[in-house]
């Protein structure tokens, strides 16, 4: 009975202390080459903990899939970037996560690298508010 109580206590502690995969507010730097500067935009994305494991002995019959916190549903919003040249397209469309879950990283829609550029990277070096 004590071991069951201990397991329950540890499970509750993990649920409280370790954030699960959930929506979070982030600030991203958006840029267009025609505008030559970056603008900070607030959006919603997924962050948190997903249970995963890396087996010591690899089984070729069973693929080892690491799960990451990623979007389940998203919508796109569009903003007009101020200060762009008159002849250029000053609209920028960016993703907004509306629901999150733990899943395999989809490299077709997500940067699955260990060290990506990050959401605040600006190739022009100048940020406009």
Curated annotation (Swiss-Prot):
Keywords: Disulfide bond, Glycoprotein, Hormone, Secreted, Signal. It is found in: Secreted. Residues 1-18 form the signal peptide. Gene3D superfamilies: Cystine-knot cytokines. Disulfide bonds join 21-69, 35-84, 38-122, 46-100, 50-102, 105-112. Glycans are attached at residues 25, 42. Pfam families: Cys_knot. The keyword Cytoplasm does not apply. One of its GO terms (biological process) is regulation of signaling receptor activity. Belongs to the glycoprotein hormones subunit beta family. Together with the alpha chain CGA constitutes follitropin, the follicle-stimulating hormone, and provides its biological specificity to the hormone heterodimer. Binds FSHR, a G protein-coupled receptor, on target cells to activate downstream signaling pathways. Follitropin is involved in follicle development and spermatogenesis in reproductive organs. Heterodimer. The active follitropin is a heterodimer composed of an alpha chain/CGA shared with other hormones and a unique beta chain/FSHB shown here. This is Follitropin subunit beta. It comes from Meriones unguiculatus (Mongolian jird). The lineage of its organism: Eukaryota, Metazoa, Chordata, Craniata, Vertebrata.
């Amino acid at each position: 009975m004590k071991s069951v109580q201990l397991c329950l206590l540890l499970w509750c502690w993990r649920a409280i202390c370790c954030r699960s995969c959930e929506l979070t507010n982030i600030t991203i730097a958006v840029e267009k080459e025609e505008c030559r500067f970056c603008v900070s935009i607030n959006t919603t994305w997924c962050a948190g903990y997903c249970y995963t494991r890396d087996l010591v002995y690899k089984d070729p019959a069973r693929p080892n899939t690491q799960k990451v916190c990623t979007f389940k549903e998203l919508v796109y919003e569009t903003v007009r970037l101020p200060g762009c040249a008159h002849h250029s397209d000053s609209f920028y469309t960016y993703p907004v996560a509306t629901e999150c879950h733990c899943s395999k990283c989809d490299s077709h829609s997500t940067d699955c690298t260990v060290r990506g550029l990050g959401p605040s990277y600006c190739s022009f070096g100048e940020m406009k508010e």
